[in-house]
């Protein structure tokens, strides 16, 4: 595979990955904003325990708004990821920071939300793979 076809493959990889990130964040964001049932599903899927107070429900709605905006940004960048390369860079940074926090403050995560160390490690791998894939595709796409 020559450099140009590798770059084209990498751009397509960025488009697919950003589209998947967009769909996830749009669906999760809308669900967290508008459905307590979805909130319960998401919290359980994350392996967390939460007191279902008005404060926590409202906080999850705010998290949903943030996720929805990230989904919109990812969807827009998926159309032309090289023109909007700041978006995959932002997601790389976001995923890395989440992984750092996940371990730097793991005791808070374990005690405050009842998340297991296995779930924490699996989540770290999930977001780490995405960060590496975005970085690899972005690097290869710029090597024309």
What function would you assign to each model-found segment?
Residues 58-64, 119-128:
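Alpha-helical transmembrane segments of polytopic membrane proteins
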Residues 27, 54-76, 90-93, 97:
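Core segments of alpha-helical transmembrane spans in multipass integral membrane proteins
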Residues 88-105, 124-130:
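Hydrophobic alpha-helical membrane segments
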Residues 125-144:
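Membrane-water interface at the C-terminal end of transmembrane alpha helices
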Residues 47, 111-124:
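Non-cytosolic membrane-interface motifs at loop->transmembrane helix junctions
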Residues 21-59, 64:
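Hydrophobic transmembrane helix segments
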Residues 82-86, 114:
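Membrane-helix interface segments
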Residues 1-25:
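Cytosolic juxtamembrane helix and N-cap/initiation of the first transmembrane helix
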């Amino acid at each position: 595979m020559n450099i140009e076809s590798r770059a084209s493959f990498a751009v397509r990889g960025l488009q697919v990955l950003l589209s998947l990130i967009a769909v996830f964040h749009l669906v999760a964001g809308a669900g967290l904003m508008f459905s307590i049932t979805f909130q319960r599903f998401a919290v359980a899927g994350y392996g967390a325990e939460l007191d279902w107070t008005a404060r926590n429900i409202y906080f999850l709605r705010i998290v949903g708004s943030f996720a929805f905006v990230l989904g919109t940004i990812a969807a827009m960048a998926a159309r032309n990821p090289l023109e909007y390369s700041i978006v995959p860079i932002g997601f790389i940074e976001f995923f890395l920071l989440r992984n750092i926090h996940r371990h730097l403050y793991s005791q808070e995560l374990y005690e405050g939300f009842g998340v297991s160390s296995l779930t924490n490690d699996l989540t770290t791998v999930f977001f780490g793979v995405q960060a590496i894939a975005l970085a690899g595709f972005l690097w290869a796409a710029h090597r024309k």
